[in-house]
Amino acid sequence: MQPSETIRYHGLDVLRASAMLLGLVFHAPILYYIPEIADGFKDLGISKDTMPEMELWVSVIAQWIHSWRMPVFFLISGFFSALVLHRNGLVYFLKDRFVRIGLTLIIFASLMDILDGNPTGKLNHFWFLYYLLIITALFVLTVSFGRNSAAYHLAQGLLASMQRRSGLIPFAAVMILARIICDFIDGGTVKIPTTYFDIKLGGLMYYTVWFFAGAGLFARIAILEILCQPRTLIMLGTAAMFVFPFHHAYADGFFGHLRDPDIGFGDTLMGSFFAAATTFLWSLFALGITHKFVTRGHAIITWLVELSYPVYLFHLP
């Protein structure tokens, strides 16, 4: 099944917008899971030493959002990157990405870095644009020069198998293994950069995998129809709800913050496995459910989609 030249993927638009806006919810309790930020408010009597422990219900919501939000964002970014390249060609794609990602990163990350009174090249919450810029460059190189590589043909074979529901099993195995490897590269869990020179290889590799999975999804668009079948949604949703409590029990902070330095190898491995499984299941469930039920445009949907990106950029974590 070839992608349509004119079809609009409203469900994916809504999912991407939701992922952006949920970032505001995720960042709301940021002083709890990155308590060192609280030290910037010592004049107000707030510091990491005075921060109480995060309540369970807040932790559950934050971990649930954290488990799938950014992987889904990079997945959809890969999908729409492949779509724009397919419909408009390489020159348009490069210009579009330079404006949407490159200029946005330079302007807004620099502005926030300057406004805090200590400009040191900090990325703050714009780290995802920095990684997206790097990954997009890798994507262009792969499309231009990598089509004859063994990795490319292996990925095509994996995607071909996913045109059946049973094909989700090898896909899950690859994504879970990728997460475990990337976690250990970054010292136990994937991390994010704080400055332009602070690239975390595991995190970059992990989000690259999700981006290329999204690009592959566009190439094998029939997979979307499998994901939104009722039987598939029930299977993914049930498994996702079953696995999440284990993920929450083994979760050890956020992006490495609050991580217990004495955690053992076994607990690290189990935590990585459950994190990977939770991410995979919730991401595909969200993809399938939105594609199934959001099938047409609406003024509210358009407003939500157009508003989500600038709101996320301008909010202060």
Predicted regions and their residues:
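Alpha-helical transmembrane segments and their immediate juxtamembrane cytosolic regions
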Residues: M1-P317
